[in-house]
UniProtKB/Swiss-Prot annotation:
The protein's name in its UniProt record: Alkaline phosphatase
Gene of this entry: phoA
Keyword Metal-binding in record: yes
Subcellular location: Periplasm
Binding, Zn(2+) 1: 350, 354, 435
Species this chain originates from: Escherichia fergusonii (strain ATCC 35469 / DSM 13698 / CCUG 18766 / IAM 14443 / JCM 21226 / LMG 7866 / NBRC 102419 / NCTC 12128 / CDC 0568-73)
Main subcellular location: periplasm
Disulfide bonding pattern of the chain: 191-201, 309-359
Chain positions recorded as Mg(2+) binding sites: 74, 176, 178, 345
Xref: Pfam families: Alk_phosphatase
Amino acid sequence: MKQSAIALALLSCLITPVSQAQTSQNINILENRAAQGDITMPGGARRLSGDQTEALRASLNDKPAKNIILLIGDGMGDSEITAARNYAEGAGGYFKGIDALPLTGQYTHYALDKKTGKPDYVTDSAASATAWTTGVKTYNGALGVDIHENPHTTILEMAKAAGLATGNVSTAELQDATPAALVSHVTSRKCYGPSVTSEKCPGNALEKGGKGSITEQLLNARADVTLGGGAKTFAETATAGEWQGKTLREQALARGYQIVSDAASLAAVTQAGQDKPLLGLFAEGNMPVRWHGPKASYHGNLDKPAVTCTPNPQRNETVPTLAQMTDKAIELLSKNERGFFLQVEGASIDKQDHAANPCGQIGETVDLDEAVQRALEFAKKDGNTLVIVTADHAHSSQIVAPDTKAPGLTQALNTKDGAVMAISYGNSEEDSQEHTGSQLRIAAYGPNAANVVGLTDQTDLFYTMKAALGLQ
């Protein structure tokens, strides 16, 4: 039913005038996807409150976008979204951000073998981020370069060159693959600072005539707003170039960056631009996650009681949430009359999936949803903003029957429904679960949002964003 309605809307391309009442009704049909009633009753589990045809037609907008907000749930496959929704909202519930975008598709995401150029069906975050930031497929571990190690201009670099404000927000270290792909070009994602770059990416090192480590390239890229973790690497000392002998933090300050380290100092910032770009460093490494709970274990769903996730005491009021960082980035970037490009990453869905920690993973998905809500609130008021929500790769968690005797690691959770949901991680040994290669959900709202519908590839996202902003 959904697919036929989308096809009808896209094929007809008849955008008819609608009244304010019709618009309100259309928005409700598309966005309110909660179950309509008692799920034990006939029709109670239905999510549709009416025909979608007019609502979808009204959502189509082929005008250029002034702004783009791209939100990435790292490792957020369909299973991760469903598990988080079941736990936090219930089986008949819905996310007011992730589930509220009207136009939805699926995209493929594979890397390439560096030697043969053939598909590597399971991508890492570096190759996947390079795909949507440059439009180029590459090998796992590469950032901003192709399989021949040639650099390619990123969407952030293009936006900045066109006079747009730019932002890069993540709950990970800012040197981690997803944020780093916007601002760096290195042969290995491990090259965070000068010392490791000299060892693992010698061709990228400043002393060899390269562009430097990821952190040095981040400073050179000079996005207007950069927020996340990774303060530890900024304590490293430059080993070559103009800033040799100074720490990367000292370099940032000398080059005019305003550095903040907690929620209060972030909230106090009122301006950020090329004269005084904002650099938020809120953790030595990755930022603390929202929820705690036991990691999955062998037969954990059978041998241990179901648990309820608890708040992480390390994420106190001094640590800005992803929604708060998104809000501040939008507030600052939207002051540029030419528009802006902003990428926001909920990084630890992936990291907690690797650790087989369902509470950590679910809490980070809820965090991302709150950030999506903030982006949509701005986009609806602004009218010229394209919001896109997707992931970089799929991951290992699966929802299984509570009494399953699974071969992998499992943990049972008490959901909002008062029911038990078991999560299983079974594609790797106990130390770290691995990515998976199934296609991913991509959803959008605003100008050019229709270009995510149907089956696309991760590289299509780069061209969709480039065209929407009219970048050359």
